[in-house]
């Protein structure tokens, strides 16, 4: 299509639209910057694995009164002021790095959120229907791991949200929150947006906190992995 016809061509195409929301209440509670950043990054990953391009986002949060003096912080908790400020910085940082506009932000304040913060990120993605295929795997198909470096946080990071915590946990548990890599995820978005790339992919999973056993294990009934 030329420029004058482009708008009409877009209307005439069949499109796939993905909606995804992600809650990062616990990660943001223990490490607010990283927890909120990877809330957005994790929400983007799922539509990306479906080969759709994420183009808009929404953020909804819940916190107790951030003006309460730090001296009144409950033992074992981070101050509400720290949670509110650093979570906002983390979410914004990731969005700015990856180039995603958040068109709607809602902050809810209620005393009950002192028990645990609410951090929700939601996104929408879209791709031309002709660019995406979802097929069963066949013998001889290749599995490719593509993306940034994955450390121990990306292999077993999800376990941190399931174990018991106490008043001393906040001194060490922040390290369990996964570290985001927005520039690399941005490169993957741009790669998958190319139809000649997207169209040759039969199946795709995002490499979440469940690690390689989940991301690869779901692709076929049986497979061989040579992982260095």
Positions of predicted regions on the chain:
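A glycine-rich phosphate/pyrophosphate-binding beta-strand-loop-alpha-helix module
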Residues: 38-41, 45-118, 167-173, 182
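Short, structured beta-strand/loop micro-motifs enriched in basic residues and often containing a Trp
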Residues: 119-129
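Short, Lys/Arg- and Gly-enriched loop/turn segments at beta-strand edges
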Residues: 148-160
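Single conserved hydrophobic/aromatic residue that forms the stacking wall/gate
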Residues: 1-10
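Gly-rich Lys/Arg/Thr-decorated short loops/hinges at beta-loop-alpha junctions or inter-strand turns
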Residues: 22-28, 62-75, 160-179, 194-199, ...
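Acidic/histidine-enriched ion/cofactor-binding microenvironments in catalytic or ligand-binding pockets
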Residues: 128-150
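Glycine-/charge-enriched secondary-structure boundary and capping motifs
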Residues: 116, 208-228
């Amino acid at each position: 299509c030329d420029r004058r016809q482009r708008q009409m061509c877009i209307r005439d195409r069949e499109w796939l639209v993905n909606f995804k929301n992600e809650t990062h209440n616990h990660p943001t509670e223990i490490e607010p910057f990283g927890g909120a950043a990877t809330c957005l990054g994790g929400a983007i990953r799922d539509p990306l694995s479906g080969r759709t391009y994420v183009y808009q986002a929404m953020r909804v949060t819940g916190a107790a009164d951030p003006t309460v003096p730090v001296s009144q912080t409950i033992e074992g908790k981070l101050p509400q002021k720290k949670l509110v400020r650093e979570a906002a910085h983390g979410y914004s940082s990731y969005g700015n790095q990856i180039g995603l506009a958040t068109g709607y932000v809602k902050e809810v304040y209620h005393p009950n959120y002192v028990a645990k913060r609410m951090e929700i990120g939601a996104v929408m993605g879209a791709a031309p229907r002709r660019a995406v295929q979802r097929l069963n795997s066949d013998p001889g198909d290749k599995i490719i791991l593509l993306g940034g470096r994955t450390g121990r946080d990306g292999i077993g990071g999800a376990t941190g949200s399931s174990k018991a915590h106490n008043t001393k946990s906040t001194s060490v548990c922040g390290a369990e929150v996964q570290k985001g890599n927005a520039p690399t995820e941005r490169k993957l978005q741009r790669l998958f947006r190319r139809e000649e790339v997207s169209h040759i992919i039969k199946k795709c999973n995002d490499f979440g906190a469940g690690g390689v056993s989940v991301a690869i294990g779901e692709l076929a009934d049986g497979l061989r992995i040579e992982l260095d």
